[in-house]
Amino acid sequence: MLSILFIFGLILGSFYYTAGCRIPLHLSIIAPRSSCPFCRRTLTPAELIPILSFLFQKGKCKSCGHRISFMYPAAELVTACLFAAAGIRFGISLELFPAVVFISLLIIVAVTDIHFMLIPNRILIFFLPFLAAARLISPLDSWYAGLLGAAAGFLFLAVIAAITHGGVGGGDIKLFAVIGFVLGVKMLAAAFFFSVLIGALYGAAAVLTGRLAKRQPLPFAPAIAAGSILAYLYGDSIISFYIKMALG
């Protein structure tokens, strides 16, 4: 099963990266077919094979020789690994469906935020019915836990945005509402903590290495995605570990 999830993740990861690059530009995610961003030549089926095509072509376009962004194979590999991690965590269970849908959403919004500093409403709206169906299939502790989580996620980020005078974007606020719906209040708090920690560490490293100016805006969705997935898959284990450490 893990190999199937991994391969499935490779294929969808390629599609998710393309979708994340096209949706903010109001382009179709289906047509035209993928092409080289430099010479605009339509890629052949062999050039669309996840990971392998990048390796065989040595990271370059066969036609014009320009280097292909490493983000393409990175998105494929990250999605594949996360799908497999969900399979390891939940096995063949009802919770595997919301896990795959949730990871898919977070991969796409991470891509849009990296490239455009934007989390389009249409992506969140598209995924809402699937996440709602997923929570009907595999509910949280109570039927209202998801609604409480959504309200908590929205209000908490909205308050932070008001205090920081726009330090948090509207897309981040709505994304956290969706995350709260999926995770519930308890894991939402863990997701927020992990997200802030990851974002702070990345931001500090980027400033120290000169990749980011001190006051330059930083896309927060990738950190939110990483922190939320960490909380979703391993939050209970991490919390239990620290409680045991605190109690000696």
Curated annotation (Swiss-Prot):
Q: What is this protein called?
A: Prepilin leader peptidase/N-methyltransferase
Q: Where in the cell is it found?
A: Cell membrane
Q: What is its EC number?
A: 3.4.23.43, 2.1.1.-
Q: What does this protein do?
A: Plays a role in type II pseudopili formation by proteolytically removing the leader sequence from substrate proteins and subsequently monomethylating the alpha-amino group of the newly exposed N-terminal phenylalanine. Substrates include proteins required for biogenesis of the type II general secretory apparatus.
Q: Which organism is it from?
A: Bacillus subtilis (strain 168)
Q: How is the cofactor bound?
A: Zinc is required for the N-terminal methylation of the mature pilin, but not for signal peptide cleavage.
User: What's the catalysed reaction?
Assistant: Typically cleaves a -Gly-|-Phe- bond to release an N-terminal, basic peptide of 5-8 residues from type IV prepilin, and then N-methylates the new N-terminal amino group, the methyl donor being S-adenosyl-L-methionine
Q: Does the keyword Metal-binding apply?
A: yes
What switches on expression, per the entry, is described as: By several proteins including Spo0A, Spo0H, Sin, AbrB, DegS, DegU, ComA, ComB and ComK.
Q: What topology does it adopt in the membrane?
A: Multi-pass membrane protein
Give me the segments passing through the membrane: 1-21, 68-88, 90-110, 114-134, 143-163, 178-198, 223-243
Give the binding site residues for Zn(2+).
36, 39, 61, 64
Keywords in alphabetical order: Cell membrane, Competence, Hydrolase, Membrane, Metal-binding, Methyltransferase, Multifunctional enzyme, Protease, S-adenosyl-L-methionine, Sporulation, Transferase, Transmembrane, Transmembrane helix, Zinc
Q: Identify the main location.
A: membrane
GO process annotations (BP): establishment of competence for transformation; methylation; signal peptide processing; sporulation resulting in formation of a cellular spore
Which cofactors does this protein require?
Answer: Zn(2+)
* Family, per entry: Belongs to the peptidase A24 family.
Name residues in a coiled coil.
none
Q: Which GO terms describe its molecular function?
A: aspartic-type endopeptidase activity; metal ion binding; methyltransferase activity
UniProt GO cellular component terms: plasma membrane
